[in-house]
Amino acid sequence: MSEQQPEKTVAPVAEVPEVPEIPEAPESQPVTTTAAEAPKDTVPAPEAHPETHSEPKAEPAADVAAPLPAVAEAPAEAEDTAAAEQPEPEPAAEQQPEKPAYLAQNPALGQFFDRLPAILSATGHEEMWGVSLKDSDDVPTVNVLIKFLRANEGNVKLAEEQLTKALKWRQEMNPTALVESATYNAAKFGGLGYLTTYKDANGAQTVVTWNIYGGVKDMNKTFGDMDEFVKWRVALMEMAVKELKMAEATSVIEYDGEDPYQMLQVHDYLNVSFLRLNPAIKAATKKTIEVFTTAYPELLREKFFVNVPAIMGWMFAAMKVFLSKNTTRKFHPISNGANLAREFPALKDQFPKAYGGGGPALQDGARTVNLVQEPEAVPVPAPAPAPAPAAAEPAPQEEAKEESKEEPKAEPVAEPAKADAAVTTQEAATTAEAK
């Protein structure tokens, strides 16, 4: 038995160097003992202490096995490094600027702004109502686009088409120049259009344009040149738009809320006969409506038709059939103009007395376009007698031949009558139009 013990101790010493070659089987350490003594070494743990003093060399096996977790952790560290190197999607989302509330709440408005650069490029004009159209960060620009979008009930395509037409029209018409540098004949347009601005106790401003159609002195002169009439109306409208000060806006208007950038219009039809409107008036009125509908959307808060005969109420009832509710709700016919000021209690004292207020007359306290007194063209009678001498030359010869037979006929007098007949025809046509 004593000879077997040295063999048992020598065998483990010889196998110690081989322990590192078995890193994945730490349970194999008990295998180094012989089959006969395995139960003695493993069961009575206290008794094994004296005999295991020779096994401290086996502890390096445990030390060698200790780095195993480190080797196993290496792939995890590599995965962490690879994951860190992969781009994260979060920074990309953070780079997108947050949309303003007026764009987030109204996707159609955002789409309209997406089309704005193409619109400005196609028209070559960027000014609208004194506002230089820019981007969605510019408050005045936002308000302009909201008006065009609202006028088309949120339809982006229709709003784009209208804005394009309006920009082209402003480029061609140059309405700013119609106010600043153009002049208008006082004989044709004097006393027909005014602009007033009233403020209530809180400082809120109300802009009013007045169209006094009953003040027309000569229908043919005022409405005969349709283009001239439209320019005069545009000039008055541009004066009112300038008073709205849209370019100075600092807050975006609510799409469905109050809009401070709107005006009132008053059309006075005192002494105007609705039953005898000549074609010139109808043509000028139609053209004006077309221009204003395209170029000035959502600038009208309310329109008052004053001094309208009660019998003409059917006209406004018919208008409701062809116009949208959003438009007709702004129209207010008033048979007696003196009742107009009642509609605005806070401004009653500032309205003209003729309209039920306590303020000065329009001729004294209101503004108007640049009027000039132009000399009226005096008809020159020279062209009328011109053909008479040429036609009268053969007449005396015929009279000389017939002196002995009969008295001369009044042919020389009949020739000038042709010129008079032309004048008479023109007057008759004018009278017919007036009727």
From Swiss-Prot:
GO molecular function, one term: metal ion binding
Main localization (coarse): cytoplasm
Annotated catalysed reactions: a 1,2-diacyl-sn-glycero-3-phospho-(1D-myo-inositol)(in) = a 1,2-diacyl-sn-glycero-3-phospho-(1D-myo-inositol)(out)
Biased composition (Basic and acidic residues): 48-60, 398-412
Superkingdom of source: Eukaryota
Cofactor: heme b
Pfam family, one: CRAL_TRIO
Biological role: Non-classical phosphatidylinositol (PtdIns) transfer protein (PITP), which exhibits PtdIns-binding/transfer activity in the absence of detectable PtdCho-binding/transfer activity. Regulates PtdIns(4,5)P2 homeostasis at the plasma membrane. Heme-binding protein that may play a role in organic oxidant-induced stress responses.
Protein name (Swiss-Prot/TrEMBL): Phosphatidylinositol transfer protein sfh5
The organism of origin for this protein: Aspergillus clavatus (strain ATCC 1007 / CBS 513.65 / DSM 816 / NCTC 3887 / NRRL 1 / QM 1276 / 107)
Gene name of this polypeptide: sfh5
